[in-house]
Design a protein with these regions (language model features):
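Conserved, mostly hydrophobic/aromatic
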Residues: 208
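Basic, often amphipathic N-terminal segments
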Residues: 1-103, 116, 120-202, 215-250, ...
């Protein structure tokens, strides 16, 4: 199937953090529904739409395995099975609380302090699922190399298809596009107040989520969430129906392969 897949961390879709993040971005990546944002008084709707355009398309998430096209010889069902196996072998854990921060000109939710467990999870996702990643096109590699990368980031780009992985990884849930400094400081303070009550407790990391983007400008959709340590066959079947429902919008041939599992 054409399009790109990605493996993300997402908060519990039933929880307040997911609702707040989806509301700010204006879209729920699980349901696909538009969500009415509660904007700060000083922020107009046109400016908000511009500031959140790319984050809204990607959905509220933290990247674990950056977006990739499926390698030749693999089908979506193979990736789903690998996600099941990966999640089944892991246990839930807590990461430090979040905070709203300036990340290289973007506003994002980041951890209050480093987490070895989060870093290990991201590292494992990058390496374990790399066999499913098709090599980037020459144009994609050239575009990435045009950015200001360190020598190490350039080496990571060539090895893993993305420069900000392994020791260059930084856990974050993006809230805005890159912004100019004057407006960024004011909006950061507003968003810190918006998310304040939701960023006081440790973050429960209890699964991974598989997302799919059918075309370059289309939004990423959550195909399925894989709880850590889960052996619940009924939940598995419900989740598989979710995968089938989303993919059925794009390619009936791949739908048949998934639904025959």
């Amino acid at each position: 199937m054409k399009g790109r897949y990605a493996i993300y961390f997402t908060p519990d879709p039933r929880g307040a953090l997911w609702r707040a993040g989806s509301s700010w971005l204006g879209r729920d990546a699980v349901t696909g529904a538009a969500v009415e944002p509660n904007l700060p008084p000083a922020l107009g709707r046109p400016q908000w739409r511009e500031l959140t355009e790319a984050p809204r398309r990607y959905g509220f998430h933290a990247t674990l395995k950056p977006p990739f096209r499926l390698a030749h010889g693999f089908e979506p069902v193979d990736l789903v099975s690998a996600c099941e196996d990966f999640a089944r072998s892991r246990a839930a854990f807590f990461a430090p609380p979040l905070r709203v921060a300036d990340v290289d000109g973007f506003i994002a939710l980041t951890l209050h302090e480093p987490s070895a467990a989060i870093d290990a999870l991201a590292r494992d996702c990058v390496s374990v699922f790399d066999r499913f990643r098709a090599p980037p096109s020459a144009a994609e590699t050239t575009r990435r190399q045009a950015a200001t990368l360190t020598r190490r980031q350039g080496a990571l780009l060539l090895r893993w298809g993305y420069p900000y992985v392994m020791e260059e990884f930084r856990f974050h849930l993006t809230l805005t596009e890159r912004m100019n400094q004057p407006g960024r400081a004011a909006l950061l303070n507003s968003l810190a107040a918006t998310f304040d009550r939701l960023t006081r407790a440790p973050v429960r990391v209890d699964g991974i989520a598989l997302f799919f983007q059918p075309s370059a400008r289309a939004p990423f959709a959550a195909l399925r969430r894989f709880p850590f340590g889960s052996h619940d066959d009924r939940a598995k079947r419900r989740s598989e129906r979710r995968v089938v429902s989303v993919l059925s919008q794009f390619d009936k041939k791949d739908l048949a392969k998934l639904s025959s599992r």
